[in-house]
Design a protein with these regions (language model features):
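Conserved GNAT acetyl-CoA-binding A-motif
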Residues: 115-127
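Conserved glycine-rich acetyl-CoA-binding loop
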Residues: 82, 95-106, 118, 135
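Conserved acetyl-CoA-binding loop-helix of GNAT-fold acetyltransferases
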Residues: 91-94, 100-113, 125
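Conserved beta-strand in the GNAT
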Residues: 61, 67-77, 88, 93
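C-terminal "cap" of GNAT-fold acetyltransferases
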Residues: 124-129, 143-167
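Active-site rim helix/loop that mediates acceptor-substrate recognition in acyltransferases
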Residues: 34-63, 69
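Conserved N-terminal entry element of GNAT/NAT acetyltransferase domains
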Residues: 1-24, 161-167
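Helix-loop element at the rim of GNAT/NAT acetyltransferase active sites that forms part
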Residues: 19, 26-40
Length: 167
């Protein structure tokens, strides 16, 4: 069991079929990362991800007191030009009330462990957030292009077995 910064129990779990928090999770992923009218995209993607709990894509939530306080997803591709790289970490989110308590770092570490369980040696992400991922051992390895043609930095980290940052 992990604990939040206020000492209350916190758990990180993969969304599974019939999860009672599924609807709330869809809403949070969509409202945080989606576009207006795009809820069906997230619901469909997340529903179909539930067919193989050991594969990708997979969606995860951090829960405290029955409230979703963080999210991330492991995806085959994060809608960018680098189709040769996989898997991708996407949708990393920490509730503003939980920021500063290392939940983001815990979710990043959890993602690396889950990536290794799926047989991958590394994980990728795109972000224009400078300095955040680097402090957790992620390396900038270049750029990808999104569907609008804009460049966005690519970050890479190894799973724990392959030498991921253990801090």
């Amino acid at each position: 069991m992990r604990y939040a910064k206020d000492g209350q129990p916190l758990r990180v779990q993969q969304l599974v079929r019939n999860d009672r928090l599924f609807g709330r999770a869809v809403d949070l992923f969509w409202k945080t990362w989606g576009e207006e009218g795009g809820r069906l995209f997230y619901e469909d993607a997340m529903t179909h991800a539930l067919t193989d709990v050991e594969g990708t894509p997979s969606f995860y939530i951090a829960v405290k007191d029955d409230v979703i306080v963080g999210t991330y997803a492991l995806l085959r591709n994060d809608l960018n030009s680098r189709q040769d790289l996989q898997p991708w970490l996407a949708c990393l989110y920490v509730d503003p009330e939980m920021r500063g308590g290392a939940l983001g770092a815990k979710l990043l570490g959890h993602a690396l462990v889950e990536t290794e369980k799926r047989g991958y040696r590394s994980l990728h992400l795109t972000s224009d957030l400078h300095g955040y991922y680097e402090k957790y051992g992620w390396k900038n390895i270049g750029v990808a292009y999104n569907t609008s043609g804009e460049s966005i930095p690519i970050f890479h980290n190894y799973t724990r077995k392959e030498g991921a940052d253990q801090s």
